[in-house]
Amino acid sequence: IGYLKLLKKNGVKRVVLTSSMVALMGGKKTGTIIPEDWTDLNSKNISTYFKSKTLAERAAWDFINNQSGGQSLELVTINPGGVFGPPLGDNLSGASMSMMVKFLGGKIPMVPNASFPMVDVRDVAYLHVAALTKTKAANQRFIATEKIGRSFQSICQLLIDNGYKGPSTKVAPNFMLKFLSIFDR
């Protein structure tokens, strides 16, 4: 919030915040996700990562919605799914790239029986530019992902089909994932 205050004080008109799909979908079991959705922070199965992304974006919107004095700062949030594509450099530490590196290196012996919403990094970049330049984008949230997520198993199979040896297509039993989720609080 300190950055938003500083930007407003210095006359910046609009800020584009990269949030995440996890700020919209946590706690939702089925159905379509829309920009008005928010992760249910009271849901018992929400990870700390989901909570942190949701709280950060909510704080930004609270600041925007409670501004007083001077020109109002506009906010646009981009909520991407897993972001994949060519990296800018050698740093592969982002959440999506780290996961892919683990798949490629055979570090994940089993995959969850779940789907994963994905988006190309170049599409996310385009959305950021549009969010800054399009008048209608002011004070809106934009979901950046394909309509239907891909299963982790199909992602790994695609990697195998393209010559990678590390990925596993073995699906982890749901009970194992539920047990392991206890430690992600």
Which residue stretches match the model-derived regions?
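Conserved Rossmann-fold NAD(P)-dependent oxidoreductase catalytic core, especially the SDR/UDP-sugar
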Residues: 1-47, 68-69
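Active-site Tyr-X1-5-Lys
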Residues: 9, 43-76
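Conserved SDR Rossmann-fold cofactor-binding beta-strand/turn motif
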Residues: 19, 79-80, 84
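Glycine/proline-rich active-site loop of Rossmann-fold NAD(P)-dependent oxidoreductases
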Residues: 69-71, 85-98, 131-142
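A conserved pocket-lining segment of Rossmann-fold NAD(P)-dependent short-chain dehydrogenase/reductase
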Residues: 40-45, 89-90, 97-119
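Conserved loop-to-helix N-cap of the C-terminal "lid" that shapes the substrate pocket in Rossmann-like
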Residues: 51, 77, 112-125, 141, ...
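Mid/C-terminal beta-alpha module of Rossmann-like enzyme folds, strongest
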Residues: 127-185
